[in-house]
Amino acid sequence: KSNQSTRIRLNSTVVHVRHQGSGAGRSVEVNYVHNGLTHKVRGKACVMACWNTVIPYLVPELPAQQKEALAYGTKGPVVYTSVGIKNWKAFENLGINRIYTPSMHHYRVLLDEAVSLGDLHHAESPNEPIILSLARYPAAPGLPKKEQLIEGRRELLNTSFEFYERSIRDQLGRVLGGGGFDPGRDIFGIAVNRWPHGYSYTYNTLDEPWDWVFTSSDERPCVVGRQPYGQITIANADAAASPHTDAAILEAHRAVEEVMSFI
């Protein structure tokens, strides 16, 4: 609205960010594409809140060391699958609410959380329909972590929905069949949510220094990469090397405080 100071540009992809001018008149210019046309805006400062690995391409004037630090990690691929079933009698008959299956395509199967919201009510009886939550973290055992994540992403992108459907029906039939579950009869819907670039990269003691994992060392790539550059600051979960919401919120708070210190 015209009386608001905030402007949100939907469906607009940023392609280039750089400083303009010098001294007190210095600003940040942001170029973006909307409906096939390039536009630009200027401001006193800019917060880069996208993936770390993308930032060096958008802000090519960054120092080489900072670019290297931002490019260090890689996103972890994730598959979260929801399966609608007509009832959960099989779970009741087996006396379980979740199953861990490390040798199958989805490593975990569990009953959805009993949450009601407004007019939407969770299943209260085993005779009622419910959603099953399945999870898979594609990887390639035996390789260093980053290589595993890259190979897992390749697998995810090359796996067809038909394969997911067949493997889900087979898996649920095998683990729940003893409780009377029939995949052909009891499944009424499958939604496969694929995140090829899912969770932020986290450090581990097999491939990286212990202090990166167990301390807040300033030597960590996430710390080197998130340093302010001129009037450009960086905020995202990658900047904390953590996939959690609280980390993203804390990094956003830090980046905005940095902006407030020089505008």
Q: Which stretches of residues belong to each language-model region?
A:
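Conserved flavin/dinucleotide-binding core of flavoenzymes
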Residues: V33, G84, A90-I263
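Mid-domain catalytic core of redox enzymes
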Residues: T6, L10-L143
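Short mixed-charge
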Residues: K1-S5
